[in-house]
Amino acid sequence: MDLHNIREDYSKQELSQANCHADPIQQFEQWLEEAITAKANEPTAMNVATVLDGKPTSRIVLLKEVNPNGFVFFTNYQSRKGQAIEQNPYVALTFFWAELERSVRIEGRIEKISAEQSDNYFASRPYTSRVGAWASNQSQVLSSKSELVAKAALIAAKHPLHVPRPPHWGGYIVLPERIEFWQGRPSRLHDRICYRLVEGAWHKERLSP
């Protein structure tokens, strides 16, 4: 399959160091809001990269909160990503908003949020999603799809109204140490503005594309 001629030339916007916020979290919130306004497809979807036994792996997860401390998502703690995080508590996140020709890369340490925070979010989820969190042994081999459906039915019968949060399911927060904003530009002369956390303060610099 020859893919040599598949390419795009980016020209929608530019990114200057002077116009970026001093705080990268604020800059991210601005870009995320613009992605939502532009009706970007799945604007909160992000690639979460982890390392397990020295081997990288990645998957798409939905961002559920951004606050001054970092970026929050929820998952099964016993999943492959959960095992990787337990072994190596450093991850990388990547957002890509094709409609705006933009990308954001985030690197940092990850830790669990409080049980209370996880309880509150879990209670806000649709009933079927709460049932699914119990039914799925995430990342484990299934003999068939019917096995999963049957298990979900048993959980629903056991908890027809209130579904408690599984102890193996909850939230993580990524505490950023490096955040890079990428804006596509013509002739591959892209804009890259990088923030690095140095002794508690953010340092902003332009990188070569």
From Swiss-Prot:
SUPFAM superfamilies the record matches: FMN-binding split barrel
The lineage's top-level taxon is: Bacteria
Gene3D superfamilies, sorted: Electron Transport, Fmn-binding Protein, Chain A
Cite a single GO MF annotation.
pyridoxamine phosphate oxidase activity
Q: Which Pfam families match?
A: PNP_phzG_C, PNPOx_N
Cofactor note, please?
Binds 1 FMN per subunit.
Which pathway does it serve? Cofactor metabolism; pyridoxal 5'-phosphate salvage; pyridoxal 5'-phosphate from pyridoxamine 5'-phosphate: step 1/1; Cofactor metabolism; pyridoxal 5'-phosphate salvage; pyridoxal 5'-phosphate from pyridoxine 5'-phosphate: step 1/1
Detail which positions bind substrate.
R7, E8, D9, Y10, K64, Y121, R125, S129, R188, L189, H190
Known partners and oligomeric status: Homodimer.
PANTHER family under this entry?
PYRIDOXINE-5'-PHOSPHATE OXIDASE, PYRIDOXINE-5-PHOSPHATE OXIDASE
Q: What does this protein do?
A: Catalyzes the oxidation of either pyridoxine 5'-phosphate (PNP) or pyridoxamine 5'-phosphate (PMP) into pyridoxal 5'-phosphate (PLP).
Family per similarity comment? Belongs to the pyridoxamine 5'-phosphate oxidase family.
Name of this protein: Pyridoxine/pyridoxamine 5'-phosphate oxidase
Q: Which organism is it from?
A: Actinobacillus pleuropneumoniae serotype 5b (strain L20)
Biological classification of the source: Bacteria, Pseudomonadati, Pseudomonadota, Gammaproteobacteria, Pasteurellales
Gene that codes for this? pdxH
